[in-house]
Amino acid sequence: MYEGKHIHYSEVDHKPLCSYSPKLCKQRRLNGYAFCIRHVLEDRTAPFRQCEYVAKYNSQRCTNPIPKAHDRKYCNSHLQVMGVLPKKERKKKQDTIESLALNITVPSLALKTHNGLEILPPSPPPALVCLLPSDPFSFYKEEKMLKSSGAFLKKPQETLNHKQKQQDHSVDTNHLRTSSLPSTLSHSCLPPLLTGRATQTPINPSSPRAATPTVRSGSLFKTSSSLQDTHQGSKDSTDNKIKLDLNHAFDKKVVPAASGMAPCCDDTQSQLIKKCTVAMQQQAPCLKKLHRLMDQHKGRFQDLNSHLGLDWSEDSEEEDGDWKLVSYQCQRLQEKRSEESRSWAERLAGFCSYLRQKHMHLCREQRGFRRERRSQHALRKALVQAAREEPHQTAQLIQEQHQVTSAPSSTAVSLAGDDSGLCQAVVKGENCRNSALPFTRHCFQHILQNRSQQLFSSCTARFADGAQCSIPVFDITHQTPLCDEHAKKMDNFLRGDISRRTYHHHQQIQRHRPLKKAKPPALSKKHKKKGKRGTQRRPQKPIPPALPQGNLALPSILCLPSQPSGIRSPLTPDLSADEFPDDITNDISDIPHDLELNQEDFSDVLPRLPDDLQDFDLFEGKNSELLPTSEEAEELVRVLQAMGSYPESLACLSGMAELGPVEGVDCRSMPGGVVDLLSARLSAETLSSLELDPSLLHPSEDAFPPSPPSPQPPLTPPSSVGHLTDSTYTQRQPHLLAKMEDSKADLANLPLGKDEDVSHGSWGVLALPLSDSSQFHSLIASDGLLMPTGLSTPCQPSSALSALPQSSQTRSTTTSPTSQTKHLPPPPTVQALWDPSRLTAAP
């Protein structure tokens, strides 16, 4: 036998309980299994299967077991939910008599005393004695009772008195003699007190038939008179009750024996009695004896409980004992209620009295069964003797007795008279011709007309119009029986097609799937970004630079017609070709040059900005498609690190500003833009917004006088210009180094802020004629590094523009500094001196 993990026992009777493995269960085990009915499915060998009902809210299967013998897939509870079975009704309140009987009944454990002896079970009150059976052996079969009585009383002959033995002996020896009838009747049917008086009456042995009624009638009158004489002076109520009971029982038992027929007072029965008496006078002695014994047996058969002390064949003391038995039980019940604790002697005496009363009851039952056996044996012998001597008359006598016995019972007559085996149902005025079922009078179709049958029931299914199916069903296993047709329909409905079941299952899943609530975009919060995915992002185009808020009209000479990647600077860091940003000149070439932004242009943009600007990113879309890539972020960090050497760049600018006109070269022969670029000088106004020390910069009017406009001479070859620039820079290098050391100490105290911008200064509006890349050959240093337009250090324009003439500034200024400061914030640092976004391509 398979057992689970939790093996434990009951605290009451120490029997093993359910051994369900997942949790502790204190229910009783099923017979032959280690689990209760709730958890028996853990044992795979158990004849149960699991209910196939699946809950909709959690998609879990029911765990109730179903016997495999039942042809169903759902348990009773879910069949009730589905409407197949009717729901259970609440139990009605019990009747007052039943509740009273249940309250009086005491459990068996409460009947045990502390010393182990069992207290007598309390008897019901006198009001319930007539309702409850007092004798458990009253309706048992004869053979069973004989065995039980023999087991209880091994020596029954010892308990019988000597008088009873003499009576039994006289019955056994003289049962064939007709003359012994008065004596046997007097001894068997009358109480012992009256037997002596009845035997003292004169009896004529020559005429037994005439003497018998006189003796019986005389004994009857003498009995009543003797009872009146005996109890005349008694005033006890109990004695009067006993006298009435004795008279009633005596009249009931003696009159049938005297008349020789059943106890009825109808006219038909009296006529039958007269006919029988006349026939008995003309019959043979064997037939008379048979007739007498049959009457006696019939009288005993009509009394269902002939052995319960109502036969009066014993001493009168036994009747008193029977009366004391009831009073004893009531007394025991009263004592149990009044006295809870008694001594050992009292309990032992009560137990002995209980056993004595039980013994008397069993002896009385045994004597009654013995009398029944003797009477049946005598009747059989008389019947055999009469059949041998007078067979025709014996058969006629038996037939007459049978008719008399079956006359009061109409049911027995109908059953005995109709042996055709056909159905007795009447359909539309015609009798049914179908054969009846065994032991019934109806066929299968009309068996429901028999109200007394309990095996068949009507089909519980209903049609579409509400009418119930009337086909009989023999089904004792289901609570709602169905006929074959409706049972097949129910099976098809429960099983169904696989595709239909799967379809409904998916429909239920989709129906009960929780819907996502759409949140408004204004209430949606920015969630944390997930970690980097395994796939790398594609490189995206850089963010176009933000335009200044001032006048965006740029002069046409700042347009870049070609790629600016060829510009080199001595201070530009080494950048590979793939690290250069994409060309943005094509993107900004469509912007008109005379585009101006006013305050009204921002009236529609500013109200749309969120209140909390901490998490707001101007250059970030909904899907973050404009965020810079990791490569761009690393390049930006590297460029910012290279921009940390701005003091040296400023020192170079101040040193290059002291360079005069190039010797041996006529700068006026060059084009105007190149001459202005080479002869440019830094003045105090140029870097006024940087708040630098005035000692670092020379006054423009002393050291750098403006050159008057003159016709431009032809350009010098680029090679000569570059050579001259290199030689001049080499000659002035010691002086520049000295200036750089002085400027480091002075620029250490510069107030540089992150929020300042100098793009509105002279560098922002500087006119650069970039029509030809050969004009920038003079800016190329010996190291040959390139200067990109997108990402460059602020030192690049400082070193390159230090040689520009001052006259170029006067020609290129298109907007006053005061007008630009109205729209732009103060300059943050020197890092914004060189802004390539200011350069636009020429249309």
UniProtKB/Swiss-Prot annotation:
A Pfam family cross-referenced in the UniProt record is zf-C3Hc3H
Annotated Basic and acidic residues bias: 159-175
Q: Per the record, where are the segments of Pro residues compositional bias?
A: 705-717
By its UniProt entry, which PANTHER family does this protein fall under? INO80 COMPLEX SUBUNIT D, PTHR16198
Q: Which protein is depicted?
A: INO80 complex subunit D-B
The Polar residues compositionally biased stretches are: 176-187, 197-216, 221-231
Give its localization.
Nucleus
Q: Report whether Glycoprotein shows up as a keyword of the record.
A: no
Function, please? Answer: Putative regulatory component of the chromatin remodeling INO80 complex which is involved in transcriptional regulation, DNA replication and probably DNA repair.
Primary site of residence:
nucleus
Q: Subunit structure, per the record?
A: Component of the chromatin-remodeling INO80 complex.
Region annotated Disordered, chain positions: 159-216, 221-240, 503-550, 695-726, 791-843
Species of origin reads Danio rerio
Cellular component annotations (GO), alphabetically ordered: nucleus
Q: What keywords would UniProt list here?
A: DNA damage, DNA recombination, DNA repair, Nucleus, Transcription, Transcription regulation
GO biological process terms held by the UniProt record: DNA recombination; DNA repair
User: What family does the database annotate?
Assistant: Belongs to the INO80D family.
Which stretches are tagged as biased composition: Low complexity? 796-821
Write out the biased-composition intervals (Basic residues): 503-540
Lineage per the UniProt record: Eukaryota, Metazoa, Chordata, Craniata, Vertebrata
